[in-house]
């Protein structure tokens, strides 16, 4: 207030309300992976977290889908084949995929299709020269330390790497979440390396690889999903490459008309490459006239539509948070753009996933007749912990901690006296009361749902005050999901 030296009227404003707690964000994921590009105009976005809100913005800054190439050939063996059919004895119609598989674009489609919104993208490389490895992921995680708004970490392409690399990436991610103490990791289980590998071996390998540190800061989902991101029109002659198409008499047999058509399609001048138009014309002819080619095209589509569930689950987290609140378990929810899970999990099999001896629970995605495909699990990897067994409990606590922490910064260097303690207690109590009214805390009255303690002789000693320390204790009763519902029926004697 100005000093009163000149006669006149002076205005003094006083705050009528105390400082309030602003709710922290709860479902802002950061996706780390390979993109077509990473630019904003002339600015490079490589290894730089960039905020987007839609698939349109993703394409604007990070480009479109990859252009996979599948080679079709006539071979004398069936090794390394995505699709293989013996046409005549000793000769195989074979489809192989020699190019690296980049899936972040498709995973982002799944994220937005399942309720996702605002998120961050960290591009660690491009399709031409990028790869997912431990060093790239560590650099990306370091860049995310500066973005406190991020609350979920997802690396959907980790499972495209070798099993050992995937293990190291996942342990780095969960360590990052535990050290930051404001974010949660969503994991996938590495796919089978051989068809004969069992589901139990897959799960055991993941549980062994994830380690034992900060397990409450992550959750895993199983199995892979057969999605509908890729349609028939996305599979054309530029995807299915058949450079030996002009000479396939042994395959087509009597179908000389088709052979002649292909010869015309691929008639090129010496020294020039086959055009995409020629490839697409041949592709259309083969689809109509040869069932084996159509089967191969469908197999390629199925292969590209096979995606891990983590990105879709990030969308589910965002949708549930926005509609019900972070305290609602992200389970018993249907998945969009999913035709089926790759494995059919029975009740008996889920027992070992949901409640393993080591506590490292894996949340199942299951098909229920007449209901659809649902997320059927809500546990963290710390399933043996009474405190942090459930995803919504861990994430609700992160939400409360981050919100209160941000609000408490306003009181740093304030006098460590009773008035300050009272203001702090009132501010935190008001925030928790709002959470309780929304259903985030359990209790019929506020006193049963939470309590805030601060003050000399209550949470602090005289030494604490002398050393500039203010200690606050907050007790909360977070709601827990009804994971098991038991209904008892008993007959009673007729009364009239």
Predicted segments, located by residue:
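Extracytoplasmic, non-cytosolic globular domains
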Residues: 170-173
